[in-house]
Amino acid sequence: MRSYPLSEADKIVACLTPDYGLIRLVAKGARKIKSRFSGSIEPFSVGEIAFYRREDAELGILRSIELKQSYFHLAKNVNMVAALAYFGELLADFSPPHEPNENLYRMARACFKAVAGVSDDQNKMGAGVLYFELWILRLTGYLPASNVCGECRSPIRPDESVVWSSENRFLCELCAPVGRGIILKPQQAVLLSLARKLAPEAFIAQSVYKREFLKPHSAITRKLIKQVLLRDLEYWSEKNWEAVEL
Protein backbone atom coordinates (compact mmCIF):
# COMPACT_ATOMS: atom_id res chain seq x y z
CA MET A 1 0.00 0.00 0.00
CA ARG A 2 2.80 2.39 0.84
CA SER A 3 6.50 2.50 1.64
CA TYR A 4 8.70 4.88 3.59
CA PRO A 5 12.40 5.18 4.43
CA LEU A 6 13.83 3.25 7.37
CA SER A 7 17.51 3.99 6.90
CA GLU A 8 19.88 5.18 4.21
CA ALA A 9 19.47 1.90 2.32
CA ASP A 10 16.26 0.29 3.57
CA LYS A 11 12.52 0.90 3.36
CA ILE A 12 9.51 -0.23 5.34
CA VAL A 13 6.74 -1.57 3.13
CA ALA A 14 3.13 -1.80 4.31
CA CYS A 15 1.26 -4.66 2.63
CA LEU A 16 -2.34 -5.83 2.83
CA THR A 17 -2.58 -9.60 2.50
CA PRO A 18 -5.54 -12.02 2.47
CA ASP A 19 -3.91 -14.50 4.87
CA TYR A 20 -2.01 -12.29 7.31
CA GLY A 21 -3.88 -8.99 7.22
CA LEU A 22 -1.87 -5.78 7.34
CA ILE A 23 1.86 -6.43 7.68
CA ARG A 24 4.89 -4.16 7.68
CA LEU A 25 8.10 -5.49 6.22
CA VAL A 26 11.66 -4.22 5.92
CA ALA A 27 12.88 -4.23 2.32
CA LYS A 28 16.64 -4.29 2.76
CA GLY A 29 18.55 -2.27 0.17
CA ALA A 30 15.34 -0.97 -1.41
CA ARG A 31 16.65 2.61 -1.50
CA LYS A 32 19.77 1.66 -3.43
CA ILE A 33 19.92 2.44 -7.15
CA LYS A 34 20.42 -1.20 -8.13
CA SER A 35 17.99 -2.65 -5.63
CA ARG A 36 16.40 -6.01 -6.42
CA PHE A 37 13.11 -4.46 -5.32
CA SER A 38 13.32 -1.63 -7.84
CA GLY A 39 9.92 -1.00 -9.45
CA SER A 40 8.18 -3.78 -7.52
CA ILE A 41 7.27 -2.10 -4.22
CA GLU A 42 5.65 1.02 -5.59
CA PRO A 43 2.36 2.03 -3.96
CA PHE A 44 -0.75 0.10 -5.06
CA SER A 45 1.24 -2.73 -6.67
CA VAL A 46 -0.15 -6.27 -6.51
CA GLY A 47 2.19 -9.22 -6.17
CA GLU A 48 3.16 -12.42 -4.41
CA ILE A 49 5.57 -11.90 -1.53
CA ALA A 50 7.82 -14.10 0.55
CA PHE A 51 8.67 -12.79 3.99
CA TYR A 52 9.85 -13.77 7.44
CA ARG A 53 8.51 -12.44 10.74
CA ARG A 54 8.85 -13.65 14.29
CA GLU A 55 5.52 -14.14 16.00
CA ASP A 56 6.05 -11.31 18.48
CA ALA A 57 7.76 -8.89 16.07
CA GLU A 58 6.09 -5.76 14.67
CA LEU A 59 8.26 -5.78 11.53
CA GLY A 60 9.13 -8.66 9.25
CA ILE A 61 11.73 -9.05 6.50
CA LEU A 62 10.69 -8.97 2.85
CA ARG A 63 12.50 -11.79 1.09
CA SER A 64 11.14 -11.43 -2.43
CA ILE A 65 8.23 -10.11 -4.44
CA GLU A 66 6.82 -11.26 -7.78
CA LEU A 67 4.97 -8.32 -9.30
CA LYS A 68 1.57 -9.25 -10.76
CA GLN A 69 0.05 -5.85 -11.42
CA SER A 70 1.25 -2.26 -11.14
CA TYR A 71 -0.66 1.01 -11.11
CA PHE A 72 2.48 3.12 -11.34
CA HIS A 73 1.41 4.41 -14.76
CA LEU A 74 -1.36 6.35 -13.01
CA ALA A 75 1.15 8.53 -11.15
CA LYS A 76 0.74 11.36 -13.68
CA ASN A 77 -2.96 11.73 -12.73
CA VAL A 78 -2.98 13.86 -9.58
CA ASN A 79 -6.58 13.12 -8.62
CA MET A 80 -6.12 9.41 -9.25
CA VAL A 81 -3.05 9.34 -7.02
CA ALA A 82 -5.02 11.19 -4.33
CA ALA A 83 -7.87 8.68 -4.52
CA LEU A 84 -5.65 5.59 -4.38
CA ALA A 85 -3.49 7.08 -1.63
CA TYR A 86 -6.69 7.76 0.29
CA PHE A 87 -7.64 4.09 -0.06
CA GLY A 88 -4.24 3.15 1.33
CA GLU A 89 -4.63 5.54 4.24
CA LEU A 90 -8.03 4.12 5.17
CA LEU A 91 -6.79 0.54 4.89
CA ALA A 92 -3.84 1.34 7.14
CA ASP A 93 -6.14 2.91 9.73
CA PHE A 94 -9.00 0.40 9.63
CA SER A 95 -6.96 -2.82 9.31
CA PRO A 96 -5.55 -4.10 12.64
CA PRO A 97 -2.03 -5.48 12.06
CA HIS A 98 -1.75 -9.23 11.55
CA GLU A 99 -5.52 -9.83 11.58
CA PRO A 100 -6.65 -11.50 8.32
CA ASN A 101 -9.78 -10.12 6.67
CA GLU A 102 -10.19 -11.71 3.27
CA ASN A 103 -13.40 -9.79 2.52
CA LEU A 104 -11.63 -6.50 3.14
CA TYR A 105 -8.70 -7.59 0.96
CA ARG A 106 -10.96 -8.64 -1.92
CA MET A 107 -12.99 -5.42 -1.65
CA ALA A 108 -9.83 -3.32 -1.71
CA ARG A 109 -8.46 -5.06 -4.80
CA ALA A 110 -11.78 -4.73 -6.62
CA CYS A 111 -12.00 -1.01 -5.79
CA PHE A 112 -8.40 -0.31 -6.80
CA LYS A 113 -9.07 -1.98 -10.15
CA ALA A 114 -12.39 -0.20 -10.69
CA VAL A 115 -11.14 3.28 -9.83
CA ALA A 116 -7.94 2.80 -11.82
CA GLY A 117 -10.11 2.10 -14.86
CA VAL A 118 -12.07 5.36 -14.86
CA SER A 119 -9.19 7.44 -16.24
CA ASP A 120 -9.85 11.18 -15.81
CA ASP A 121 -13.61 10.94 -15.22
CA GLN A 122 -14.04 12.82 -11.95
CA ASN A 123 -17.66 11.78 -11.47
CA LYS A 124 -16.81 8.09 -11.72
CA MET A 125 -13.77 8.56 -9.50
CA GLY A 126 -15.93 10.18 -6.83
CA ALA A 127 -18.42 7.30 -7.04
CA GLY A 128 -15.59 4.80 -6.62
CA VAL A 129 -14.28 6.63 -3.56
CA LEU A 130 -17.75 6.67 -2.01
CA TYR A 131 -18.17 2.93 -2.65
CA PHE A 132 -14.85 2.24 -0.94
CA GLU A 133 -15.78 4.39 2.07
CA LEU A 134 -19.15 2.68 2.48
CA TRP A 135 -17.68 -0.80 2.28
CA ILE A 136 -14.68 -0.27 4.55
CA LEU A 137 -17.04 1.16 7.17
CA ARG A 138 -19.45 -1.74 6.68
CA LEU A 139 -16.79 -4.48 6.80
CA THR A 140 -15.23 -3.06 9.96
CA GLY A 141 -18.57 -2.72 11.71
CA TYR A 142 -18.94 1.06 11.80
CA LEU A 143 -21.73 1.58 9.25
CA PRO A 144 -25.23 0.81 10.57
CA ALA A 145 -27.95 -0.67 8.38
CA SER A 146 -29.69 1.91 6.23
CA ASN A 147 -32.83 -0.14 5.54
CA VAL A 148 -33.92 -0.32 9.19
CA CYS A 149 -34.62 2.65 11.47
CA GLY A 150 -32.02 2.88 14.21
CA GLU A 151 -34.67 4.08 16.69
CA CYS A 152 -37.92 2.15 16.18
CA ARG A 153 -36.31 -0.74 14.23
CA SER A 154 -39.01 -0.58 11.57
CA PRO A 155 -38.02 -1.30 7.95
CA ILE A 156 -37.46 1.85 5.91
CA ARG A 157 -39.50 1.65 2.71
CA PRO A 158 -37.91 2.36 -0.69
CA ASP A 159 -40.28 5.32 -1.14
CA GLU A 160 -39.35 6.83 2.24
CA SER A 161 -36.62 9.36 3.01
CA VAL A 162 -33.75 8.35 5.29
CA VAL A 163 -32.15 10.71 7.82
CA TRP A 164 -28.59 10.39 9.09
CA SER A 165 -28.66 11.64 12.68
CA SER A 166 -25.97 13.24 14.81
CA GLU A 167 -25.92 9.97 16.80
CA ASN A 168 -24.61 8.17 13.70
CA ARG A 169 -27.80 6.27 12.92
CA PHE A 170 -30.12 6.05 9.94
CA LEU A 171 -33.63 7.04 11.04
CA CYS A 172 -37.05 6.90 9.43
CA GLU A 173 -38.99 10.12 8.86
CA LEU A 174 -41.15 9.60 11.96
CA CYS A 175 -38.20 9.17 14.34
CA ALA A 176 -35.89 11.80 12.87
CA PRO A 177 -35.62 15.16 14.71
CA VAL A 178 -37.16 17.96 12.66
CA GLY A 179 -34.58 20.06 10.83
CA ARG A 180 -31.61 18.04 12.01
CA GLY A 181 -29.35 15.53 10.31
CA ILE A 182 -28.59 14.78 6.67
CA ILE A 183 -31.73 13.95 4.71
CA LEU A 184 -31.53 11.44 1.88
CA LYS A 185 -34.61 11.48 -0.31
CA PRO A 186 -35.77 8.14 -1.74
CA GLN A 187 -34.00 8.71 -5.06
CA GLN A 188 -30.83 9.56 -3.12
CA ALA A 189 -31.03 6.73 -0.59
CA VAL A 190 -31.10 4.19 -3.42
CA LEU A 191 -27.31 4.58 -3.72
CA LEU A 192 -26.91 2.90 -0.33
CA SER A 193 -28.87 -0.09 -1.60
CA LEU A 194 -26.87 -0.18 -4.83
CA ALA A 195 -23.58 -0.16 -2.91
CA ARG A 196 -24.70 -3.20 -0.91
CA LYS A 197 -25.71 -5.18 -4.00
CA LEU A 198 -23.30 -4.21 -6.78
CA ALA A 199 -19.62 -4.73 -7.54
CA PRO A 200 -17.64 -1.46 -7.69
CA GLU A 201 -17.60 -1.24 -11.50
CA ALA A 202 -21.38 -1.66 -11.68
CA PHE A 203 -21.93 0.83 -8.85
CA ILE A 204 -19.77 3.41 -10.60
CA ALA A 205 -21.68 2.88 -13.85
CA GLN A 206 -25.04 3.33 -12.09
CA SER A 207 -23.92 6.29 -9.98
CA VAL A 208 -22.71 8.36 -12.91
CA TYR A 209 -26.38 9.06 -13.69
CA LYS A 210 -26.99 10.07 -10.07
CA ARG A 211 -23.86 12.14 -9.56
CA GLU A 212 -25.78 14.97 -7.88
CA PHE A 213 -26.47 12.51 -5.03
CA LEU A 214 -22.84 11.65 -4.28
CA LYS A 215 -22.00 14.57 -2.01
CA PRO A 216 -24.69 13.96 0.66
CA HIS A 217 -23.54 10.35 1.00
CA SER A 218 -19.92 11.44 1.12
CA ALA A 219 -20.77 13.91 3.89
CA ILE A 220 -22.10 10.98 5.91
CA THR A 221 -19.10 8.73 5.35
CA ARG A 222 -16.63 11.56 6.04
CA LYS A 223 -18.31 12.49 9.32
CA LEU A 224 -18.29 8.86 10.42
CA ILE A 225 -14.69 8.24 9.35
CA LYS A 226 -13.52 11.39 11.14
CA GLN A 227 -15.28 10.33 14.33
CA VAL A 228 -13.74 6.86 14.16
CA LEU A 229 -10.20 8.05 13.41
CA LEU A 230 -10.40 11.26 15.47
CA ARG A 231 -8.60 13.23 12.77
CA ASP A 232 -9.03 14.78 9.36
CA LEU A 233 -8.04 12.81 6.29
CA GLU A 234 -4.82 13.60 4.51
CA TYR A 235 -5.38 12.72 0.88
CA TRP A 236 -8.81 12.74 -0.77
CA SER A 237 -10.77 15.60 0.77
CA GLU A 238 -13.32 18.28 -0.03
CA LYS A 239 -10.92 19.91 -2.47
CA ASN A 240 -11.15 16.80 -4.66
CA TRP A 241 -14.94 16.95 -4.62
CA GLU A 242 -14.76 20.48 -6.00
CA ALA A 243 -13.52 18.94 -9.24
CA VAL A 244 -16.53 16.63 -9.50
CA GLU A 245 -19.12 18.08 -11.86
CA LEU A 246 -22.52 18.34 -10.21
Which residues make up each language-model segment?
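Non-catalytic alpha-helical scaffolds and adjoining flexible linkers that form interface surfaces
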Residues: 1-12, 16-246
